[in-house]
Amino acid sequence: MKNFWKISVFFCVCSCLGPWVSATLKRRARFPANSISNGGSELCPKIRIGQDDLPGFDLISQFQIEKAASRRTIQRVVGSTALQVAYKLGSNVDFRIPTRHLYPSGLPEEYSFLTTFRMTGSTLEKHWNIWQIQDSAGREQVGVKINGQTKSVAFSYKGLDGSLQTAAFLNLPSLFDSRWHKLMIGVERTSATLFIDCIRIESLPIKPRGQIDADGFAVLGKLVDNPQVSVPFELQWMLIHCDPLRPRRETCHELPIRITTSQTTDERGPPGEQGPPGPPGPPGVPGIDGIDGDRGPKGPPGPPGPPGDPGKPGAPGKPGTPGADGLTGPDGSPGSVGPRGQKGEPGVPGSRGFPGRGIPGPPGPPGTTGLPGELGRVGPIGDPGKRGPPGPPGPPGPSGTIGFHDGDPLCPNSCPPGRSGYPGLPGMRGHKGAKGEIGEPGRQGHKGEEGDQGELGEVGAQGPPGPQGLRGITGIVGDKGEKGARGFDGEPGPQGIPGAAGDQGQRGPPGETGPKGDRGIQGSRGIPGSPGPKGDTGLPGVDGRDGIPGMPGTKGEAGKPGPPGDVGLQGLPGVPGIPGAKGVAGEKGNTGAPGKPGQLGSSGKPGQQGPPGEVGPRGPRGLPGSRGPVGPEGSPGIPGKLGSVGSPGLPGLPGPPGLPGMKGDRGVFGEPGPKGEQGASGEEGEAGARGDLGDMGQPGPKGSVGNPGEPGLRGPEGIRGLPGVEGPRGPPGPRGMQGEQGATGLPGIQGPPGRAPTDQHIKQVCMRVVQEHFVEMAASLKRPDTGASGLPGRPGPPGPPGPPGENGFPGQMGIRGLPGIKGPPGALGLRGPKGDLGEKGERGPPGRGPKGLPGAIGLPGDPGPASYGKNGRDGEQGPPGVAGIPGVPGPPGPPGPPGFCEPASCTLQSGQRAFSKGPDK
């Protein structure tokens, strides 16, 4: 089967929490605020002071007071005139915003503070901050204080030395009369000037100011003595403007007319004749965002729409849950030799394979010593062989390992009996005896000479993660996320084009001309007049801001199935299936003639190594055999250290495999062996389960509503994605039928001897084996016909070998002992004769292999039924229309009544919403 790179590195997606602001009630309800940072190093641009296009920052928008009113957290009230709206801030509300979201680089050196407000009740006698910036410890850095006890206003600021400086404006009784007032402070480099109701009160010198700490909060309406307590007052307008001279140009037309006792009024005369049309008025300002409408009823299912354009590739989805096992794919041709893998852990022993039988071939290169296999079943008693001559004394055997004893940490209570010790070193080779008759399989004999190459060792466990693979195929577009919370206002943008003129007001009836009266005493300021006739088309207005995204509509009913799409590209290979159950072994047939090479069979699991047979005499060297069919992929060899990549040599003719050699002692854990050959890809697996819902994305820009489309043509295949996370390792399946014998691969580079395991590692391995096989060993100890073996003693010095005795009866199978320490790799044995070609096995059931790569993106699904959501907010203002043809000038009329226009609200603010002195009702 085809091998895939495995990767075990997970990519974590950190979702960033957006900035937060709060307006907390006594139950601590929070209101988010909008950031006004322009992203630069300073809050205000360095351009000529005195222009109305300098940016300003509406604190009512920043503190989300309008949204709080729509939630009925605070109350909307009538403002200074019937055309104005104000907000009544009670003592149960706490408006505060992190300073870093408003002024990340601090306040500018020069600016102005403007507000229209009214105090009532007990607030007239309190000492409180209408606006204040605190540091992280709650200490004041900048603020405007109103003192009802001393009838004064104070501007506080942080000096260069960090101390709090104050400029106090005294004797202001007219401010504390429960009426609407407009308070403005122009902060310049060396002075602070107070304006009340557009009248300049006083200018006081101030010292150089220090930089504020942006880690604190900006608050509204707090007591000076207890900054945690809010003060009730009514707020219509509050603005921070980059022009310190803005208060000098402000008007107070929105304030009610004040009639004093020192003024007299005359009767108002009749209206004059209609005056001529006035000059074009200034461009109107965008209106405030409307309140979200209620969700509409669920609409009926819509008809299937036309095919839509192919969607853009979606972001990679989260790793899905492991899919079901797929069917075993067809066997592929052998791949090129891959790079040497990392060191693997010992794998689960495989079942024993069927012995092969082939034409004897030339001796192969010496093979590495295999890992010790389990004890095989005792065979029937063989015929007695001829007695050979006594051999010479063998050399002393190595000392055995110290056995466990009761009380040892590995077996604190009682140690299980150990297995028989490993055989000693081979003795000197005796004289060649007469050839005996072929006997039945006998019990295990003395350890013979170094055998031929043994069977492949156990499959190692998964190694460490390999290098990062290629980028994965783009995942399917995820479901639409829920509506996110409204973010902060964006940064101030460039100055937009002027807006279109407002709607024409109703023309008033012309009045009759009255008799000219005597000149009277100058009257008080008149009330605003009716709007004049429509002027010429003004310049285009500023584009309005995007509205808040509407609530998602209810899920519609499923639409009708669309027409079948085009045939897609071939899918990626699926997950290998689970191996099938072991078939019933057939009767042994007669040896047939060598057959033609068959088709490549599926790879079977490595079998358990059987007990070594008696070493027979070496036969004459046979002729080279014909090239056999490619066999199944072998198990990983003894790992060696990663060697340098050598130049590939010319492939030699593969020789037949040698006879299995005697199992050697278990060697130490070696370095990783070379990577096996790459197999063919498997069949496409079943679709995996749907992944978890992704994190909520940021709200996207408002788009136009399009017609639902039918599935489009399949797009090109995306970039290959990262390999998925490897699923949990399944249990070993039953042994499959033996595959055809494959050609022996080129011998790998001989690695250096492995490092000896540490004592701690040996104890861990022994403890794990004891825990896994303790039940089995305990059951074996209870057999009535077998006595429990004692603890292994220290081996004594070997005596001279005696003459071989008669073959005795086979003994019972011993208790499976603890695995020994892995011995050093043995020398490669001679290549044995090639076995007979076995019959091709039936196709096994689905195997279970590593998780395959994600499948290609499927075709777009059928469009869902149309549904009616909530009424959305008004769309953005369209582009200005083409100016019309100028009309014929009319005859001049008499002067009309005074018009009403609020210069502050008619001013264009770059990148900001309209800074009117209060939203219209």
Curated annotation (Swiss-Prot):
In what way is this protein post-translationally modified?
A: Covalently linked to the telopeptides of type II collagen by lysine-derived cross-links.
Q: Which Gene3D superfamilies did the record assign?
A: 2.60.120.200
Which Cys residues form disulphide pairs? C44-C242, C198-C252
Q: Where in the numbering of this chain does the Laminin G-like domain appear? A: 50-244
Collagen-like domain location is: 269-325, 326-356, 358-403, 416-472, 473-512, 604-656, 657-711, 712-755, 790-847
Span list, region Nonhelical region (NC4) = 24-268
Compositionally biased tracts (Basic and acidic residues): 479-489, 833-845
Query: Signal peptide span per the entry?
Result: 1-23
User: From which residue to which does any coiled coil extend?
Assistant: none
Which sites bind Zn(2+)?
A: D213, D215, H253
GO MF annotation list: metal ion binding
Q: Give me the ranges of the annotated region Disordered.
A: 253-759, 783-921
What residue spans carry the region label Nonhelical region (NC3)?
Answer: 406-417
Which superkingdom, per the lineage? Eukaryota
User: Which compartments does it reside in?
Assistant: Secreted, Extracellular space, Extracellular matrix
- Which residue windows does the record flag with biased composition (Pro residues)? 273-285, 298-310, 387-398, 794-804, 888-900
By sequence similarity, the record places it as follows: Belongs to the fibril-associated collagens with interrupted helices (FACIT) family.
Q: What does this protein do?
A: Structural component of hyaline cartilage and vitreous of the eye.
- What's noted about domains in the record? Each subunit is composed of three triple-helical domains interspersed with non-collagenous domains. The globular domain at the N-terminus of type IX collagen molecules represents the NC4 domain which may participate in electrostatic interactions with polyanionic glycosaminoglycans in cartilage.
**Protein name as catalogued:** Collagen alpha-1(IX) chain
Q: What is the native source organism of this protein?
A: Mus musculus (Mouse)
Protein's gene:
Col9a1
